[in-house]
Amino acid sequence: MKNKNSEQNTHSTIGEQDIHYFHEGKHIYAYEFMGAHKACEEGIEGIRFTTWAPNAKSICVIGDFNYWQVEDKNYMEPITDAGLWSVFIPNAKNGDKYKFVVTNKDTNHYVYKSDPYAFFSELRPNTASIITTETQYTWSDDKWLEKRAKTNYYDNPMNVYELHLASWKTKNGKFLTYDELSETLPQYIKEMGYTHVEFMPLHEHPLDASWGYQPTGFYSVNSRHGDIIGLKRLVDKLHNNDIGVILDWVPGHFCKDQHGLIYFDGSPCYEYQEPTKAINKGWGTHNFDLGRNEVKCFLISNAMYWINEFHIDGLRVDAVSNILYLNYDREDGQWIPNIYGGHENLEGIAFLKELNGVLKHTCKGVITIAEESSSWPDISTPIEKGGLGFDFKWNMGWMNDTLRYISLDPVYRKYHHNLITFSMVYHYSEKFILSISHDEVVHGKKSLINKMWGDLWNKYAGLRLYMSYMIGHPGKKLIFMGSEFVQFVEWREYEQLQWQVVDQYESHKQTLHFFKKLNDFYHNETALWQCDYNHHGFRWIDADNSQQSILSFIRSSKDNKQKLIFICNFTPVTYYDYHLGVPDAGSYKEVFNSDNLEFGGSGQVMATEIFSSPQSSHGFEQRITIKIPPMATLVLKLIK
């Protein structure tokens, strides 16, 4: 997958084809020659620095190697008229800190900038880039990569654990290193039964409270946890435990701290020229100019960098709506329509298609996931069929509706029954992932357990009911860390999760056990993931029982040999002698019950098989009569 261009120009060791494709916006390995790279020129070893700054008058490299002095010999030379600059510095070496002094050609004003392509950077509050040439790692995940290339994720289990590294666990209040995380995280994820971990952004960012979503160093590994080798070792360890790694990736906007990409050459460079398009007031950031060739190279090469160098298995693309809409988070008069008079960002659309097209062509088995909150059509439709080409899309509508529903007093749920059923009306329009992410447990939104209605018992029961319903609902799954053991406080990025409650309180231990059993149940039952995006895989038994707030539906495998019947009771009422239509004659056995005593429930379980009778119900010729426990999900399976 490496770039093989080798033709040289007269100015540097950068290939002529590299330069051509870079300015054409078609280079997908720009990180191989942009930034700081070890070189030997005319028999002398050193570092070649290369950057792009089309409106620069001059650029000087300063750093540890020259005592941070501006010297004539360290000024870059312009390679092209389109803004590519480069210089070879003999005495620069691995580990040296450095910056670029960029002078604007119109104002003569100069700025001190970090290297946009730096592989490593100083820990905040310091902002220098660090020469990093020792990045080789001996991987041991060949079997995983081979399996990944052959996997069809649509008909395989996908149960994602979303994770913020800095606050998952700490050591005496300090960040764990990637190596320390390697000793505990893979084992925990595997024991809990998750198939993937999703890391919130791992590129360098100055503000902890931004969670990584306002980056400055897109190619720089988050220095809070260690170095490049440490992160590679962590990913390798996860792969060796059969755990996929998804990375939150932010290609729409960037932090406006002065050492970063903002006005890199003293004028709009990585951002749009037009202020109404460039300035993102809502987030206090700048939007990338996605129509500029060199910016597209920067971003698509960045995606390739994380995938190639760190063996990342998928990218969750952040804030896709901000890329698609010119009027995103803007009032009338604060945005300029496109050439057709619409609000669609044509450059953003083209960029997303190009990104997904490149990854599909070059990175077999790597997936892309859109975090997109609007009703934009065909997000996960292939490019050749007119879509954007993402593999999956987060189902924000399902999340909003169902979280609202479970917060209601059960007395009033009958009047809002559509909130829990409406998702199946549009489910097959996209390849949805059901996500309960970090955004839902911060900023006054309450922790997941505190979203539940009722006293403490009903909150725990409601959580088990809701999670079991989620497992049964078609679509892949994602849950944010801490929910699995019932963290009561909202997520706080500045401290570790409240792991101590698992040892202190039986209810937390029981819920952690519940999540493990639920995840194992999901993984072991083909019907729960093989036909997520095929109408064959789901059928309502009764979607309309609003009076009792009970849902019932069937999940089926491709060959129809496995069928699971879900009954979800969203009230604290036990229903006796409940008649339920079933698709097949025979005996049915309980295979999962969220009311089980071992989970902290009331223990109203079905100890014996139930036989169907030839009586019509819910459109079926057979029916069973069961007891439905309160605030619980009951799952039955035909056994003979």
UniProtKB/Swiss-Prot annotation:
The active site is at 318 (nucleophile), 371 (proton donor). Pfam families: Alpha-amylase, Alpha-amylase_C, CBM_48. One of its GO terms (molecular function) is cation binding. It catalyses: Transfers a segment of a (1->4)-alpha-D-glucan chain to a primary hydroxy group in a similar glucan chain. One of its GO terms (biological process) is glycogen biosynthetic process. Pathway: Glycan biosynthesis; glycogen biosynthesis. SUPFAM superfamilies: (Trans)glycosidases, E set domains, Glycosyl hydrolase domain. Belongs to the glycosyl hydrolase 13 family. GlgB subfamily. HAMAP family: GlgB (MF_00685). Catalyzes the formation of the alpha-1,6-glucosidic linkages in glycogen by scission of a 1,4-alpha-linked oligosaccharide from growing alpha-1,4-glucan chains and the subsequent attachment of the oligosaccharide to the alpha-1,6 position. This is 1,4-alpha-glucan branching enzyme GlgB. It comes from Francisella tularensis subsp. tularensis (strain WY96-3418).
